[in-house]
Amino acid sequence: MLTWLHTDVTAKTLVVYYSYTGNCREIVTTLTSQMEADVLEIQPAEKGLKYEANNYALGTQLLNAIKANPNDAGSYPAIDPVATSLNDYETIIIVTPLWWSLMAANMQTYLFNYGSQMAGKNVGLIVSSASSGISGVVDDCKRLVPEGKYFSENLWINHSNHSNRATLIQEWLTAIDYNTVTGISETKTTATAPTRIYDLGGRLMAEEPSKGIYIKNGKKVIR
């Protein structure tokens, strides 16, 4: 017996990330090996900056400017223009470094500019840090994306467990019930070949699988 479920391919996931040291980029690579998603990398407009130089002087300066006037667009560092429309996505996963107990300034810029467009969307947060806890980053995210539908748990990956990120990500996706929240769930049929494909509304879509996301024998299949 075949078990198939067809979902609306427009209900997609976007992973938005900023990476300074490369750790968040590695996290995103691992994450997207376990799920289907588009990826958007946030880049600072001014290249080659050393945020950690002179005892983290520049990074601290950027964060202090945001803290002083968090509602002023001029407080946030410039980032490269972003062409990706959030209208195409139902789920946004934010992957960001922690800077001095707060969200990295460049990611704060992106969320200041686009966080209001995430209202009503599923929002997940993955934070990379050396060792510090992530409560300040969570607070920044909820300030900048106040109307997001946050998953039940955030994921913290630090220096000591970064090498184990594949397992941590897999456990997190299970804990937040990602497949169910995003419309991927199992359904069974006793129908014989040819296999009929139905959408979530019960409408017949095709006699054979076409492009989309399916569940085959309890496993997600991308065609």
Positions of the model-derived regions?
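Solvent-exposed loop/turn segments at secondary-structure junctions
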Residues: 20-23, 44-48, 98-102, 129-133, ...
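Short, conserved loop/helix-junction motifs that constitute active-site signature segments
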Residues: 33, 86-87, 112-120, 132, ...
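Residue-level detector of functionally pivotal "anchor" positions at catalytic/ligand-binding pockets or at interdomain
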Residues: 179-201
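N-terminal beta1-alpha1-beta2 submodule of the flavodoxin-like/Rossmannoid cofactor-binding fold
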Residues: 6-94, 103, 170, 174
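Glycine-rich phosphate/pyrophosphate-binding loop and the adjoining helix
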Residues: 150-181
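A glycine-anchored, Pro-Gly-centered beta-turn/N-cap motif
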Residues: 121, 210-213
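Short, glycine-/small-residue-rich phosphate/pyrophosphate-handling segment
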Residues: 124-157
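C-terminal tail/sorting-segment detector
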Residues: 213-223
